Each structure stands twice: as structure tokens, then as C-alpha cells.
Design a protein with these regions (language model features):
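Short coil-to-beta-strand
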Residues: 32-33, 63, 71
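Canonical Radical SAM [4Fe-4S] cluster-binding loop centered on the CxxxCxxC motif
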Residues: 3, 13-53
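Class I S-adenosyl-L-methionine
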Residues: 1-24, 151-172
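Short, basic/hydrophobic alpha-helical segments
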Residues: 59-67
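Surface-exposed amphipathic alpha-helices with a cationic face
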Residues: 92-105
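Core AdoMet radical
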Residues: 38-54, 67-87, 105-120, 129, ...
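Conserved strand-to-helix beginnings and helix N-cap segments that scaffold or border functional pockets
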Residues: 88-93, 121-125
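Well-ordered, non-membrane alpha-helical segments in soluble/globular domains
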Residues: 55-56, 60, 90-95
């Protein structure tokens, strides 16, 4: 399977407490797009860096192993674009499954999506998030930007987004 990724990097911005390995998937299926989206370069599918899925998983395993030499636990953060877009969701499922099986409680799989929990259920996408530990759901809304009195962006980035932590899979 081929997967298109815009970028992969270590980040302290994409998770509220843990060092994250952020995977920005290419392509966003939201219409209209989020006003003032800071990832416009991820909108178009099938651009940027093309990976064989197994090669991408190995790259991520190597990065996780390296990070776990210094940290007890890290986040693997799935962003975009849109990780649950039809052309990304199978890869997101396979990556999250393999990483969770290998690293178990040493990683926290965290997925960002413009979709709400209701939309995930309505679109029958629950299976794709089976190995996620946390979700940040809802479109970015710049008019509801979540900042402190000094202007620092808080988590999540807009007040309409929901941060959900759970220990077991969502049931249908």
C-alpha cells in the first residue's frame, strides 16, 4: 500500500504533555476547508512524499525506539490534512495497530480529525480508530482560537475542538 505524507517530525506542540512524533498525512476531504488552516500544503492528496506503508512503519518504529531511549512514554500523533480521509484511513489503522502492538503502553496514539464523534459514528469509521488512545475532534475554528492572556496557543487550538481520552475502543 502506498501512503502520502507531508512531513514527520518530533514535536512538543501536538500533544499537551508528551513528546510527540507527528505524522502529517497528505490530503484533506473537508469541504469547505477550515478558515485560516495552518496546513494548507496538506490539502491535496497524492502529493509530497510517497511511502510504501511497511517502509513508513519501519521509519516510525526507528523514531519511537530512539525517543524511548530518553522518554518513558511518547505520543504518536496523526494529523494532516485528514488522517480519516478515505485515501488515508487504511494506512492510519495499520500504522496505529502495528505500533500499539509493538510498543503497547509506551506510546499514546493520538488522532486529530475535523470530524466530530457523531460524524465518525455516522460514517462508520469506528474501526479505523480502534487503536487510538486519544482523539482531538472537530474542525479548527480560528474565531474560537484557544489562547491564554499572553496570546500563547493552548490545547486544543480552538475551543470547539473536543479532546477525548479513552482506554477501550468505541463500540458501535
Amino acid at each position: 500500500m502506498t501512503v502520502y505524507v507531508n512531513r514527520i517530525f518530533f514535536s512538543t506542540n501536538d500533544h499537551p504533555k508528551l513528546l510527540g512524533i507527528s505524522i502529517y498525512f497528505q490530503g484533506c476531504d473537508r469541504s469547505p476547508k477550515c478558515l485560516l488552516c495552518h496546513n494548507k500544503e496538506t490539502w491535496e492528496p497524492y502529493r509530497r512524499f510517497k511511502y510504501d506503508l511497511e517502509d513508513l512503519i519501519q521509519i516510525l518504529k526507528d523514531k519511537i525506539t530512539y525517543a524511548l531511549e530518553s522518554y518513558d512514554k511518547i505520543a504518536v500523533v496523526y494529523l494532516g490534512g485528514e488522517p480519516l480521509a478515505p485515501y488515508n484511513r487504511d494506512a492510519v489503522f495499520q500504522i496505529s495497530k502495528e505500533l500499539k502492538e509493538e510498543f503497547s503502553e509506551k506510546i499514546v496514539n493520538t488522532l486529530y480529525s475535523w470530524r466530530t464523534l457523531e460524524e465518525i459514528e455516522k460514517q462508520n469509521l469506528e474501526n479505523y480508530i480502534e487503536y487510538m488512545d486519544e482523539l482531538v475532534l472537530g474542525p479548527y475554528d480560528h474565531t474560537q482560537r484557544n489562547v491564554d492572556e499572553k496570546g500563547n496557543v493552548l490545547f486544543p487550538a480552538s475551543k470547539n475542538q473536543k479532546y477525548i481520552k479513552f482506554n477501550k475502543v468505541l463500540s458501535k
